[in-house]
Regions:
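N-terminal, positively charged nucleic-acid-binding surface of large information/translation enzymes
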Residues: 1-210
Length: 210
């Protein structure tokens, strides 16, 4: 190639990096980026990654720390703290990233929002989005819908020996419908959650079948 963009998977902003992130994600990508710089010139290569600032693991990690009195700040503060720790770790391992930002941090966050909005708007204008109601877990005691990590039960897949099953997947990788989860419990209050309908937008993938 004459120009190249090398990317490394974006870690969640719920914690610092561990060695698996370094050895399994960033070192291989770094080796490839350095190889390309040697072959086509550093000015023609961009090695990019960053912190994923959204998702259930972040919400759940933040909630647990706040409830335990171990963090006093907003969820944005929590993510930014972990982002800075991640960046420091990558620098200490001399990972040669050109850009390490975040999907909701600073200018990169603004760009992420603009592109996401434009993308969704285009899909909507072309009729490729459909609004559908699906059942989701609701904690009547907490008065809130639960994200995937806030529900735990037993995996409904026959023969599965997973010790942790969440709203729609277990830690062994089995997927299932939320209503099939066995003996679900809310991690917020410990009560059995209700199933209530929630409307979301879905991409009309069948419209693109050949």
């Amino acid at each position: 190639p004459k120009r190249a963009v090398v990317t490394a998977g974006m870690p969640y902003g719920n914690k610092p990096l561990h060695f698996g992130h370094i050895a399994g994600v960033f070192v291989p990508a770094d080796c490839f980026a350095r190889f390309l710089r040697d072959r086509i010139g550093a000015e023609n290569v961009r090695f990019i990654s960053g912190t994923d600032c959204f998702g259930s693991p972040i919400n759940e990690g933040y909630r647990k720390l706040v409830e335990a009195g171990q963090f006093d700040g907003t969820i944005e503060d929590y993510v930014l703290r972990n982002h800075n720790r991640q960046k420091d770790t990558l620098d200490s391992y001399d990972i040669s990233l050109d850009i390490y930002e975040g999907s909701n941090i600073g200018h990169s966050g603004e760009v992420h929002q603009l592109i996401s909005e434009a993308f969704i708007k285009k899909l909507y204008e072309n009729g490729w989005l459909q609004k559908r109601a699906t059942l989701q877990f609701y904690d009547p005691e907490a008065g809130t819908f639960l994200n995937g990590r806030q529900v735990q039960g037993h995996c409904p897949v026959q023969g599965c020996k997973s010790e942790h099953a969440y709203a729609d997947e277990c830690d062994l990788g089995h997927s299932y419908a939320p209503e099939d989860l066995i003996a679900p419990k809310s991690s917020l209050t410990g009560v059995t959650p209700e199933m209530r309908p929630v409307e979301n937008w879905y991409f009309d993938l069948p419209a693109f079948n050949a």
